[in-house]
């Protein structure tokens, strides 16, 4: 995973909501094997930090003002090619989440932050091979 120099999984948080970033930081760092190395409130800031910090994982909100997560995702992949990207959104599965998955992100619906912690924690256990992105099942009227 992108030449990890630290024994901890290095994570970049990109979400416009400060409370989500705070809770994610507290949950992730409580694991002891994860270090949040940066935070961004907007996609373009996340792209810049990904290039500077070279994180092992990026937790990326899909809906943000300015550059959204779907637009930022390929640029983050270019800036930090080895990083696993976990896309977060309160949106149900649909075109935006499908696009993120097609770009190689693992999608987790807010507020299931414990799944994010489990996924990022698994990187510390599994070493350089990131888990494969999973496409969630469509449910309800959106499935039509």
Predicted region positions:
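Acidic catalytic/metal-coordinating carboxylates
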Residues: 42-45, 68-71
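A short, hydrophobic beta-strand element within the central beta-sheet of small alpha/beta folds
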Residues: 82-94
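Receiver (REC) domain active-site loop signature in two-component systems and cognate sites
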Residues: 64
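Conserved acidic segment of CheY-like receiver
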Residues: 7-28
């Amino acid at each position: 995973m992108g030449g990890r120099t630290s024994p901890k999984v290095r994570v970049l948080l990109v979400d416009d909501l400060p409370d989500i970033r705070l809770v994610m930081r507290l949950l992730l760092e409580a694991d002891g094997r994860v270090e949040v190395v940066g935070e961004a409130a907007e996609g373009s800031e996340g792209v810049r930090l990904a290039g500077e910090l070279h994180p092992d994982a990026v937790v990326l909100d899909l809906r943000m003002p300015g550059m959204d997560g779907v637009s930022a995702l390929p640029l983050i992949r270019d800036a930090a090619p080895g990083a696993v990207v976990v896309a977060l959104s309160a949106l149900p599965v649909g075109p935006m989440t499908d696009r993120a998955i097609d770009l190689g992100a693992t999608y987790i619906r807010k507020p299931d932050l414990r799944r994010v912690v489990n996924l990022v924690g698994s990187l510390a256990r599994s070493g350089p091979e990131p888990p494969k992105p999973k496409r969630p099942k469509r449910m309800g009227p959106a499935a039509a």
